[in-house]
């Protein structure tokens, strides 16, 4: 229904409402009566996909710099004390299509929490001295990823799947990228993208929508202007079939996957159920087969990544280097099984209940609700209520899962990344074949 220009929807006896402030953020809120906390999630629609040549790593650098100080909170310490001093928590994360800042505070401190979020986004200092010191911190972060075989394998898989463009490269960039970023380039990126009108703010707790909207208006003010779009995703897969990294480790890291669906694809919920059957959780097929039955891995799971115009399904595992061929064979067999056989009804029901139950449990936490409504408002074509999402999960049937698996799981689509000692990296491409 529409009331006063706002659209309201039920989410299991709860409501969310939207308001687009004039030349300011879009506000979406959900009232949770009796909640003792208020969570705020602010999505700046600026991620690494917006980086121009010569700016690689600037979105992540910008996120780091906001925590160095703002006009009202001039130091990292004053920012952290403002939130932690009342028992709250806060953080931020840069993705390829957005950067999210979140805070969770006791309800009486919600104005303080909103003020800090607004300061971080709209009024950061961006001093030269802070840029110099944070540059060194980010370089150490990059080195830590390269030294971690699991992280390094993910970096290799991204380039195998998405190529060397914005979706394939590491969000942090490489050392040379960070060394080459000038203070002016960082400030220009902030001016171009960190605008109130380029932000979605989700507020969840025991407060009315008008109250949430007022807090956002006070903290963010206004600031409009066109923000450039990002280049379209390449045709996937866009990189080499196999990427390898040599590391003298006692465990090999394996990532294997296929192109999947963009986030608003009509079959997105079918893909979520397929993934739950395949490798999401300890009762999934991969866990029971690769770990429990064959004893080939300690960690094995599957997951999804989705963007506005692209996506991928990935299986990752840590195995004995000598067992890489056997692990690949077992993983590929499970992909082929989904392609060739309908999922039994009892197993399908279990996977759907796993997804539905997990979603409902998360709705008791203000931070998860803020992520649910804020992430959808920022990144999707629509905001589903929880009931609507549950209905879409329930509507998935075995025939749809098998049909989708048949479309996704083909030999030409497979991409593989492995990090292991050099002698275990030979001959991998010939093993990258699904059973007939």
Predicted regions and their residues:
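Charge-rich, well-structured scaffold segments of protease-associated domains
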Residues: 12, 16, 20, 31, ...
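Phosphate/diphosphate-binding glycine-rich loops and adjacent basic-rich segments that engage nucleotide
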Residues: 240-250, 254-257, 266
């Amino acid at each position: 229904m529409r009331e006063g220009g706002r659209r309201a929807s039920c989410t299991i006896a709860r409501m969310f409402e939207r308001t687009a402030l004039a030349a300011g953020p879009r506000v979406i809120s959900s009232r949770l009566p009796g909640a003792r906390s208020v969570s705020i999630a602010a999505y700046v629609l600026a991620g690494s996909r917006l980086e121009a040549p010569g700016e690689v790593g600037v979105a992540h650098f910008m996120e780091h710099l906001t925590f160095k100080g703002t006009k009202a909170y001039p130091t990292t310490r004053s920012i952290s004390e403002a939130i932690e001093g009342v028992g709250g928590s806060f953080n931020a994360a840069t993705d390829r299509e957005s950067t999210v800042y979140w805070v969770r505070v006791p309800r009486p401190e919600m104005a303080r929490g909103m003020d800090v979020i607004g300061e971080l986004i709209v009024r950061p200092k961006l001093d030269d001295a802070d840029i110099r010191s944070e540059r060194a911190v980010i370089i150490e972060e990059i080195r830590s990823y390269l030294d971690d075989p699991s992280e390094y394998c993910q970096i290799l898989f991204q380039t195998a799947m998405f190529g060397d463009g914005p979706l394939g490269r590491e969000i942090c960039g490489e050392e040379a990228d960070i060394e080459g970023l000038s203070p002016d380039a960082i400030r220009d990126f902030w001016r171009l993208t960190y605008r109130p009108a380029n932000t979605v703010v989700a507020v969840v707790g025991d407060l009315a929508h008008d109250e949430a909207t007022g807090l956002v208006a006070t903290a963010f003010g206004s600031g409009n202007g066109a923000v450039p779009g990002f280049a379209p995703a390449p045709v996937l897969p866009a990189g080499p079939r196999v990427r390898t990294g040599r590391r003298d480790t006692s465990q090999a890291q394996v990532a294997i996957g296929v192109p999947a669906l963009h986030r608003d694809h009509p079959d997105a919920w079918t893909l979520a159920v397929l993934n739950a059957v395949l490798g999401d959780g300890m009762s999934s097929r991969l866990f029971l087969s690769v770990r429990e039955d064959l004893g080939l891995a300690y960690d094995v799971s599957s997951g999804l990544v989705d963007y506005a115009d692209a996506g991928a399904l990935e299986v990752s595992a840590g195995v004995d280097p000598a067992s890489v061929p056997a692990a690949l064979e077992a993983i590929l067999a499970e992909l082929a099984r989904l392609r060739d056989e309908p999922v039994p009804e009892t197993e399908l029901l279990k996977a759907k209940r796993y997804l539905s139950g997990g979603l409902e449990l998360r709705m008791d936490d203000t931070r998860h609700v803020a992520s649910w409504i804020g992430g959808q408002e920022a990144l999707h074509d629509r905001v589903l209520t929880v009931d609507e999402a549950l209905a879409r999960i329930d509507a998935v049937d075995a025939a749809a899962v098998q049909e989708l698996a048949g479309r996704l799981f083909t030999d030409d689509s497979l991409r593989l990344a492995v990090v292991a000692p050099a002698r275990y990296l030979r001959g991998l491409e010939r093993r990258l074949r699904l059973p007939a």
